[in-house]
From Swiss-Prot:
It is found in: Cytoplasm. It catalyses: UDP-N-acetyl-alpha-D-muramoyl-L-alanine + D-glutamate + ATP = UDP-N-acetyl-alpha-D-muramoyl-L-alanyl-D-glutamate + ADP + phosphate + H(+). This is UDP-N-acetylmuramoylalanine--D-glutamate ligase. The lineage of its organism: Bacteria, Bacillati, Bacillota, Bacilli, Bacillales. Keywords: ATP-binding, Cell cycle, Cell division, Cell shape, Cell wall biogenesis/degradation, Cytoplasm, Ligase, Nucleotide-binding, Peptidoglycan synthesis.
Length: 449
């Protein structure tokens, strides 16, 4: 295992800048390494690149010259850089050591780790665990794919605190020594095949989360996908979660969350909506119990935690209508979960960037949809879908116009749901911007007293 003290005076090449590459480069400089940064994009006007250069770090951008490998550097790879990128392939061929930014964070911290991965739900689970810690006397620091760069947070967390880390498949691919004390796999579905090429490769990347665990560690998995790990040579203590049956772990029985025969909370008291979020809640509760969070703090969190911004986020009620912002739903699977979360009639706001998808797979989930308000490049596709199912379809220019147009047709107890099933880039820079526009427009229609 590489000790971080061994990085002093070593040549290190950070490939890929962005936030994680920027923080990794600063950390490596602090550890005494001879650092260079390389990015295929032109970074001549990039603020982070200029900041690194002011520290004496050489930044080479616009291409990946193989000459950067001639002094046999250790490679620290940004998770967004595929292993198929030319300079990474060449480094592999030369037998150079390639670290991920997450691996670097592991090398410098002695804090126990709760690591969360999965196709869906990982951000919610990570944030909910963090909230449960916050409600207790324990300290947990969020990091990773949730927006807080792991190598930065790892420098700040103390050995008696927990590092609560969300990990994407990109971050897990290529880890060597990384070992969480508690690992969670929420679920695994087909995703990111443009990066991983095959479903098997994607699944194997996710499984990296537990490969170094020992008998003193814990693995938490979805019981209904247990076949994905049953053939594995697991050393960690393995527990499951299920909303459908009693399992060795945590489950729902008679309307209560139950662990070890003890009722934790009635599901009617949960604020977070949706069957899929029940699974997320179970995983978070189990991890927090294992970590030593008191049950009272867990319950205090569950009766107040309303979700993550832009992920089936309850934003308020106007008259008798509840509004939910699910702008993060940039694919059909996420929207399936959203549509399946409500028994009330739904006014569904949908549409966005056209990636050539068809949306017929949403039909089985549209039973409660009363009105569709469609916008963006996929507007006509969604209009066709709605008409084929006999739904009332309204065309809008964008999200703001969609909120305006429903004001005269909304009925008592309708749920207003923004769940686009598409990326935002046809009209907005990010899904966050799209969600904020939705929230702002909702607030504009609130009555003033």
């Amino acid at each position: 295992m590489l000790n971080y003290t061994e990085l002093e005076n070593k040549n290190v090449l950070v490939v890929g800048l962005a936030k994680s590459g920027y923080e990794a480069a600063k950390l490596l400089l602090k550890l005494g390494a001879n650092v260079k940064v390389n990015d295929g994009k032109d970074l001549s006007q990039d603020a982070h690149a200029k900041d690194l250069e002011s520290m004496g770090i050489e930044v080479i951008s616009g291409s990946h010259p193989f000459s950067l490998l001639d002094d046999d550097p250790i490679i620290v790879k940004n998770p967004g850089i595929p292993y198929t990128v030319s300079i990474i392939k060449e480094a592999t061929n030369r037998g150079l050591k390639i670290l991920t930014e997450v691996e670097l964070s592991y090398l410098i911290s002695e804090a126990p780790i709760i690591a969360v991965t999965g196709t869906n739900g990982k951000t919610t689970v990570t944030s909910l665990i963090g909230d449960m810690f916050q409600k207790s006397v324990l300290t947990g620091r969020l990091s990773g794919n949730i927006g807080y760069v792991a190598s930065k947070v790892a420098q700040e967390v103390k050995s008696d605190e927990y590092l609560i880390t969300e990990l994407s498949s990109f971050q897990l691919l290529g880890i060597e020594e990384y070992k969480p004390h508690i690992a969670i796999i929420t679920n695994i579905y087909s995703a990111h095949l443009d990066y991983h090429e095959t479903l098997e490769n994607y699944q194997n990347a996710k499984k990296q989360i537990y490969k170094n665990q020992t008998k003193d560690d814990y693995l938490i998995c979805n019981y209904h996908q247990r076949h994905l790990i049953e053939s594995e040579n697991l050393e960690a203590k393995t527990f499951y979660f299920s909303t459908q049956q009693e399992v060795d772990g945590i489950y729902i029985k008679d309307g209560f969350i139950v662990f070890n025969g003890i009722r934790i909370i009635n599901t009617k008291d949960l604020v977070l909506p949706g069957e899929h979020n029940l699974e997320n809640i179970l995983a978070a509760v189990l991890a927090s119990i294992i970590a030593g969070v008191p049950v009272k703090a867990i319950v205090d969190s569950l009766v107040t935690f309303s979700g993550i911004d832009h992920r089936l986020q309850y934003i308020g009620t106007n008259r008798t209508n509840k509004y939910y912002n699910d702008s993060k739903a940039t694919n059909t699977l996420a929207t399936q979960f959203a549509l399946n979360s409500f028994d009330q009639p739904i006014i569904w706001l949908c549409g966005g960037l056209d990636r050539g998808n068809e949306f017929d797979e949403l039909i089985p989930y549209m039973e409660n949809v009363r009105v569709m308000v469609v916008f963006g490049e996929t507007q006509d596709k969604f209009a066709k879908l709605g008409n084929s199912q006999g739904k009332y379809v309204i065309k809008a220019t964008d999200v703001e116009d969609a909120v305006d147009k429903i004001q005269d047709i909304v009925e008592p107890n309708d749920v207003v749901l923004l769940s686009p099933a598409c990326a935002s880039w046809d009209q907005y820079h990010t899904f966050e911007e799209r969600g904020e526009k939705f929230i702002d427009r909702f607030r504009a229609h609130l009555p003033s007293y």
